[in-house]
Structures are given as structure tokens and as C-alpha cells.
């Protein structure tokens, strides 16, 4: 009735009710006048009963709160999700699910509390979430690792290609003893970025044994760099699986009296403030994390509404060359 009185579509009324910035002030005034005239009050509960939808979407983050609130990648993805949902009627419920709470989270998701779920930072051990797609619409941020998840919907970047490009760039500077600090091997980015590094070195017939692992934090990057240097083998290039670990590696390189890029050319992955504020600024692989989050939300809304959506969406990366590689 509001739409008819205001002479606009129901979608426009919905945007006005949800304070969407896409509605002009003039249209908003007309709709608000109609709402006042009809004494209309949006009733989410009634709409949920009629449509059998909750108008709620769960954002599941299988990480500790410490990592969630310090990781710029997760922050960017979540921001992309939130902005994509801002002009819709969906509310976003964030569920921070540690190992001990995974089953509780799964029960909540399957209890009719949400219309769908977005899962970011997925680990292969998170089996409680691996088969959710059989019961409700789910979109993962990152390709699944478990065989049972092969039919899942996911959005990812081409991690292997990005890592391969960064490694090839280090090679182009004349470096040949190229090490890597890889990410967790129970996460798709950790696996794929390591494979990209290996693939590039294999193409040039170079040694692939200079590998240490971290958990995407600066402290783990520093520890991995110490282990690499303690081997006593020459290293003149380093690809690090994310910028946070690269920042940790920087500190150890300087601690040992070495220079960047004079002694070791360094490249990272992510393109966040850790790399941009390093000295020298870090060559890194830019991944469109904000766009990734937005795409996850768009695909999930399409699935909820019964519209066709791609199962696999792979976004490109871009190499940003800075002073850390010469």
C-alpha cells in the first residue's frame, strides 16, 4: 500500500525503510510521507513468517578473536561483505567459532536462525562447516580443501598464480637461492601459494628445499626466518606467503646484519599496511579482498533467492613492485 500511495516500487520503499543512500532525498520524502499517512510500521517478524525467511545471514569466522581483530585481510573481507549487504534487508550475524565452539555454531546455523552463511578463513580441520551446503546456502571465502566440499560455492583469488608471479619477479632480479615462508598447510592460501613458489622454481631447475612455515602472523614469520638463516645456506631471495609474516622476517634479517634488498630481495602477498609501511616498502601481491567479500555476499543472496550463481569465482591478483626487490 505504501508503494502504491507513493507511486514507487516496493523495492524503493524497502530502500527507504533501510535508509539506503541510493534513494534521492525527494523520493525518500515522498515515501516517508506515505508511511506516515498510512501509519505503516515495518514488521520483520511478520515478513519472516510469511516468507519463511529470517532475513539474517551468518558470517562464520573459524579463528580466535585475537586473530580476527588484528588481521587486515579478514577486516577487508568483512568490510566488503558488510557494504554489499548495507542496502538490503539482510542483517549480518557474526559467529567467531573456535575449535571448541564449532559444533555449537553448526547447530545454530542449522536451527533455522539464518537464511545462509558465509565462511571465511576456512581450515581443513573445520569439518563442522564442510558439509553445511547440503542443508542451507553457504559460500566460502577460499577454495575448499576437503573432498566433501568439492561441490561448494566459493570465491577466491588465484593464489598460486600470484605466488608464481612474485617468485618470477624475484628471479628476474638475478636471485637464484630463493627461500619461502609458507602459510598453514591446512588452509587453501597456504597450500596454493607454496605450490606457486615451487612451480616457478621447478620451471628454472632451482632448489625447492628452502621452506619454513608460519601461521600468517608477524611472530611466526620472524621465527621462520630465523630457522631459514640458521640453516647456514645462502639465501638471496625470499617469497613470504603474506605481508604480516614478511614484516616479521624483515626484523630478523636486520637483526642478523643483512640488508633488503642488497642481501635478500623480499616479496610478500596481500598488499596491506604491514607491507606498505615496511622499510623499504614491500613488493607484494595485491589481492582484492574487499571485492572478494562483496562477491561472497552477492552470490549468497542469489542462492537464498533461488537465482543462478557460479560455484567457483576466481579473482585475479596484481604484483606491486616496490623497493624490497631492488
For the regions a language model picked out, list residue spans one by one.
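Residues at alpha-helix caps and immediate loop-helix transition turns in enzyme cores, especially N-
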Residues: 27, 70-73, 130-131, 190-193, ...
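Bacterial carbohydrate/catabolite-sensing allosteric modules
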Residues: 37, 83-88, 135-140, 145-326
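Short acidic active-site motifs
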Residues: 45, 104-106, 127-128, 220, ...
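N-terminal helix-turn-helix DNA-binding module of bacterial transcription factors
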Residues: 1-55, 326
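Alpha-helical recognition/docking segments in bacterial nutrient-uptake
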Residues: 56-60, 64-168, 230, 234
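Short beta-strand segments enriched in small/hydrophobic residues
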Residues: 12, 52-67, 169, 177-184
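Short loop/edge segments at beta-strand edges and connector loops
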Residues: 44, 96, 121, 213, ...
Amino acid at each position: 500500500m505504501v508503494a502504491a500511495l507513493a507511486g514507487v516500487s516496493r523495492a524503493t520503499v524497502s530502500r527507504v525503510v533501510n535508509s539506503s543512500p541510493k534513494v534521492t532525498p525527494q523520493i525518500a520524502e515522498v515515501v516517508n510521507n506515505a508511511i506516515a499517512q498510512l501509519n505503516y510500521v515495518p514488521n520483520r517478524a511478520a515478513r519472516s513468517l510469511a516468507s519463511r525467511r529470517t532475513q539474517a545471514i551468518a558470517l562464520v569466522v573459524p579463528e580466535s578473536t585475537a586473530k580476527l581483530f588484528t588481521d587486515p585481510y579478514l577486516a577487508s573481507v568483512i568490510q566488503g561483505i558488510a557494504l554489499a549487504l548495507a542496502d538490503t534487508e539482510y542483517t549480518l550475524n557474526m559467529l567467531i567459532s573456535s575449535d571448541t565452539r564449532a559444533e555449537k555454531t553448526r547447530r545454530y546455523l542449522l536451527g533455522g536462525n539464518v537464511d545462509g552463511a558465509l565462511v571465511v578463513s576456512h581450515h581443513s580441520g573445520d569439518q563442522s562447516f564442510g558439509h553445511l551446503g547440503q542443508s542451507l546456502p553457504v559460500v566460502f571465502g577460499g577454495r575448499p580443501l576437503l573432498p566433501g566440499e568439492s561441490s561448494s560455492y566459493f570465491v577466491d583469488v588465484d593464489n598460486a598464480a600470484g605466488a608464481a608471479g612474485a617468485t618470477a619477479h624475484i628471479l628476474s632480479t638475478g636471485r637464484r637461492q630463493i627461500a619461502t615462508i609458507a602459510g598453514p598447510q591446512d588452509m587453501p592460501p597456504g597450500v596454493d601459494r607454496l605450490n606457486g613458489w615451487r612451480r616457478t622454481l621447478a620451471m628454472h631447475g632451482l632448489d625447492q628445499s628452502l621452506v619454513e612455515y608460519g601461521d600468517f602472523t608477524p611472530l611466526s614469520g620472524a621465527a621462520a626466518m630465523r630457522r631459514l638463516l640458521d640453516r647456514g645456506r645462502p639465501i638471496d631471495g625470499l617469497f613470504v606467503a603474506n605481508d604480516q609474516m614478511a614484516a616479521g622476517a624483515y626484523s630478523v634479517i636486520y637483526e642478523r646484519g643483512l640488508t633488503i634488498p642488497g642481501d635478500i630481495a623480499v616479496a610478500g602477498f596481500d598488499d596491506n599496511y604491514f607491507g606498505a609501511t615496511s622499510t623499504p616498502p614491500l613488493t607484494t601481491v595485491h589481492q582484492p579482498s574487499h571485492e572478494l567479500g562483496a562477491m561472497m555476499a552477492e552470490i549468497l543472496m542469489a542462492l537464498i533467492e533461488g537465482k543462478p550463481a557460479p560455484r567457483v569465482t576466481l579473482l585475479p591478483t596484481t604484483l606491486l613492485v616496490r623497493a624490497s626487490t631492488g
